[in-house]
Amino acid sequence: EKSIENLLDKNVDLGDYIGLRFLGITLGNSKINDKKNIDSEIKAKNVYVGIMPFRSFLKQKWIVKISPNQAAINIDRDFFKRDESYKNVRSTKKLQSKYELNFNLNKYSDLKFNKAGLKTKVKGNVIYKSSNRQIIANLKSNFDKKGFLKFKFNTKLNQDFLKLDLFSNGLDLENSEYIIGNRKINFKKGTFKSNFKFNKSSKRTFCEGRFSFTNLKIKPEDFAENINSDSTRFFCKDNNLIVNSEKLNYGTLTSNFNLN
């Protein structure tokens, strides 16, 4: 537990030992929470932790498979941030071993971002590589019969590198509430679709594809009237993100606009 706490800069409770399994063990009631906010936590009823011997041998590093069951991810937006004092201590220590963590969410697990209003279920795979502090994820999100959102991302912590793919063939936004920036926005109706890719590196930043909102009706906090739009589209052209909105309406004002 102490080693994992030092690695993650979080409070760690591995829970109860349940028993041995092939090339691993099963733990019960495991949880990880933030040191500054214990209500921001990740927990699971059962967790299988095992070594992947053949891949470990071929790649010459420890590859660990972690499969949580009945997991709940209830975190705030700062959960993955680390104190500067912690970063300075880590930077002075040379990592002695290379390893790879493979998180397998085979069944849908609850995901909630406390201060963003986002609540959904996710399943998929997340890989963490210690050698370059890389995170690779391929996840599918289920919004309780309102539709699905698939996203892939690849990033290297503390480096200027990010790849993001976002896909949905139709996500119903009716009666959803989110916090964007510091403002609460109530989606009274609308549909979100996406086939969007974003890539960023130290040498280049570009995007591909598009995403859109149709039949949109929202009520931002502190706004007197609803904002309505038949169609608002964001699409990439010549490495620019262009916005096109049709019949945008606020109160008595109705217009069409384009932004580049």
Which residue stretches match the model-derived regions?
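N-terminal type II signal-anchor transmembrane helix
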Residues: 1-7, 125
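Sec-dependent signal peptide cleavage junction
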Residues: 2, 87-90
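Flexible beta-edge/linker motif
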Residues: 10-11, 15-82, 89-111, 149-154, ...
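Amphipathic hydrophobic-ligand
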Residues: 10-11, 36-51, 80, 87, ...
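Short, exposed beta-strand/loop patches in secreted or surface proteins that constitute
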Residues: 16-18, 125-130, 153-157, 232-235, ...
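Transmembrane beta-strands of outer-membrane beta-barrel pores
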Residues: 70, 107, 143, 170-172, ...
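Gram-negative outer-membrane beta-barrel proteins
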Residues: 74-76, 109-111, 147, 172-176, ...
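Short, hydrophobic/aromatic-rich segments at coil-to-beta transitions
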Residues: 100-104, 130-139, 237-244
